Amino acid sequence: MKFNLLDHGYASLIESWGSDQSIIEAARMSTNKGFLGWGEDPCPACNGTGWDPIPETTSDKECRYCKGQLKTVGDEKLLAYLYKNKHSTPFEMAGMTIEVKAPIFVFREWHRHRTQSYNEMSARYVPLPDENYVPTVERLMSGANTATTNKQAQNNGKELNNNAAIMWLENLTMLYEHAENVYQQGIELGIPKELARLAVPVARYSRMRASANLRNWLAFLTLRRAPNAQYEIRVYAEAVGKMIADRFPRTWELFNG
């Protein structure tokens, strides 16, 4: 499962472990019951009749277990209970490892989530590809328009127009080209890669692998899918959410509920 993101990036699922079922199994270790099943089944107490014969009386009464509903709700009820009441450890029994290609400035925000494990491509050892993030004019304009509700996007009270946005992007592209020339020149001159990389902008694309349990992926999404999160990391969070929805659909439904 792979999603192409921004102009040169992607997020790809490498592996996942566990499932909605394994969350239930982990929670039920304390009672040794295990996974009982999803969906509705005939009530085991009244065998689906809705009535519970009371030995000391001659009349039947409503089943005390299913309350006359004939069926019992499956383990989705327990899953919902665990999620609602923040029983966190069962959700730590499942998780995912993903590979991400994103601008370095996105990774700097991403790495604030210290409960994930990371390993990133290093410009100390290999040259980074000459790929830099170039936002669209629409992105610049939309960011300026949200400055009143998102203080990180504030534009110092200045109104951005379309021509100014285009001019700035042209200057940005020239800056990227100059930075790459300085970077390559340094390598050709014999400057160590770990120092030549000083010329690389934070818009340069890098790659990493990130791994976390399901609980911590959901915590990541709570922050990075929020409306006030920066757009560039939000698109990656949305892709992670689609991976979770595919691998853990019942938990995902609870998270979005």
Question: What residues fall within each predicted segment?
Answer:
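Family-specific signature for flavin-dependent thymidylate synthase
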Residues: M1-N47, D52, C66-G257
